[in-house]
A protein has these predicted regions:
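A composition-driven surface/loop motif
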Residues: 12-14, 20, 34-49, 55-56, ...
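Boundary at the C-terminal end of the N-terminal hydrophobic targeting segment
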Residues: 4-9
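Structural signature of tandem-repeat unit edges
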Residues: 26-32, 49-62, 72-85, 94-112
Length: 112
């Protein structure tokens, strides 16, 4: 279980991507292009927080490997049509496994 964000947090997660986490657990990824891949030893910068909802911006093309690994509080993910690649284990060990938006024709659902 991660920490709850007591204040808003933000940073970078790709060459042209930024992330922003609200204190109520909504993570928004914005910008254009590819997200970095992460690993067991180099977790995503939001990995220590309880992410409840994830909104991925319309110009993002790749969800990085292990980007949301072990996000056990995650209940909703929005994947836009611009996403053409989802990295290995991107949503591995997430409790949530049933609510992915249908805005993306390639990934109308994700095997989590």
């Amino acid at each position: 279980m991660g920490l709850s964000a007591n204040a808003e947090e933000s940073g970078t997660c790709g060459p042209d991507l930024r992330w922003h986490l609200t204190d109520n657990g909504v993570l928004t990824i914005s910008g254009k292009g590819e997200m970095y891949d992460y690993s067991y030893s180099k977790r995503a910068p939001w990995g220590k927080y309880d992410i409840k909802r994830n909104i991925i911006g319309d110009s993002i093309t790749t969800i990085g490997g292990r980007a949301f690994y072990n996000c056990s509080a995650l209940t909703s993910v929005t994947i836009p049509n611009s996403v053409t690649t989802i990295g290995e284990y991107a949503f591995h060990d997430c409790i949530y496994n049933h609510r992915t938006t249908k805005t993306n024709q390639k990934y109308p659902s994700v095997n989590l």
